[in-house]
Amino acid sequence: NQLTAIRNFIQQEVDYIVLAPVTETGWDTVLQEAKDAGIPVIIVDRMVDVSDDSLYTAWVGSNFKLEGQKAMAWLDAYLEAKGRGDEEINLVDIQGTIGASAQIGRTQGFDDAVEAHDNWTTLAQQSGEFTQAKGQEVMESILKQSGDDIDVVYCENDNEAFGAIDAIEAAGYEVGGEEGQILVMSFDTTNAGLTDTLSGKITLDTECNPLHGPRVEEIIKK
């Protein structure tokens, strides 16, 4: 539990707290406690939604909505290049943990793109909680309902993509970008995600900036 961990750090009188929040909300009280104790808090990766921005010292993270927009712009261009720009395209969005800033931004990028295309339809949109096991479970359920109709699976991180791919292949479908296969998109570009991209199982993996650590170090040194 992140709230418990932060309070433990406050009791230990640490010099800095670096927080990568699971969700955006629910941080006001504990961050106020850290501020009252004189401990700077640096937010990393996902953002927090608080009533007073002075409760944290800095945020080092990514623009998740922009990531989603760029991924969907790539999909648009890819389908055009394949001569499928005017086809009816059915999409599945395996969302991240609901309320996390990465989920909010990447879902918004997805939703905006689908809304802008009359020939794109969202067949299902359900949280995979950013985990492989839940991603597989969600994908298995969706495949039972709509397996033959799915063109694109948009996974909001690599762990979900790994689970989705396992479910797709176990159900007898192929993953990949060619006609007749299910195209899998993902985010983060972990080492395993890059491996699946190079092998063609993931057609697009949008990188999430991995350089947060050095930037946090720079902030602390200042």
Question: Where would I find each of the regions flagged by the language model?
Answer:
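A residue-level marker of the well-folded mature domains of exported/periplasmic proteins
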Residues: 1-222
